[in-house]
Amino acid sequence: YFAMDFRQDLSKPFQAPYQPSVAHYTDYYVLLISGSKAFSYAGQRIGVSCISDKLYHRAYPGLTQRYGGGTFGTVFIHRVLYALSSGTSHSAQYAMAAMLKAANEGQYNFLDEVKVYGERARRLKEIFLRHGFHLVYDNDLGDPVADGFYFTIGYPGMSSGELARELMYYGVSAISLVTTGSHQEGLRACTSFIQDHQYDQLDERMAIFAENHPIQ
């Protein structure tokens, strides 16, 4: 998810504010940008790997021993990426290149395509919070976390697994934070499948959930 922070306008190429990047803090990095995540590109699967020059040309004894030579970049491309994907179609490559070009030239505001997820998150959070839930990760360097594709919820007195199981009885599916490596109790909710007519349904069901699970 690239620049999906609607608290500020990150859609203007080469103008501040910018998308935060690990590239500001190290010379050794790989940026992985998904076509479907950045552009909501629904075609064939494609992504871009951006490797820093220093990391690309760096040699590692372990890679030399395993692959018989080469730098991180050459091993990553010719051994790892090729073995995992065998490349991708020409049509997807041309589509990705065209979208990147249009976005960089300011002709295509790709964030307009994903703003709906921010609005969905805002509405969903309001429903959950009103019925006794809390946001597990609610803070971003001192500011309220942005509304986007995902958000995290918890319920007092319930573990991640208990909450995930109980919400299934109310038609709500979410991923336990334990499976993501988190040490916090709660769930990761996704905004992608909610339909406009389902907000009222969710509100009604979470009201029943709260009634059946009074907070002590």
Predicted regions, residues:
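Short, solvent-exposed loop/turn segments at secondary-structure junctions
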Residues: 1-4, 8, 36-39, 53-56, ...
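Conserved PLP phosphate-binding loop immediately N-terminal to the Schiff-base lysine helix
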Residues: 1-20, 29
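Conserved core segment of the aminotransferase class I/II
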Residues: 25-115
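PLP-dependent enzyme catalytic core of the Aspartate aminotransferase-like
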Residues: 25-26, 165-216
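Short, conserved active-site loop motifs that form the nucleotide-linked donor/cofactor pocket
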Residues: 29, 133-134, 172
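Short amphipathic alpha-helical segments
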Residues: 45, 147-151, 185-188
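Conserved glycine-rich beta-strand-loop-beta hairpin in the small C-terminal domain of fold type I
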Residues: 90-93, 97, 110-125, 129, ...
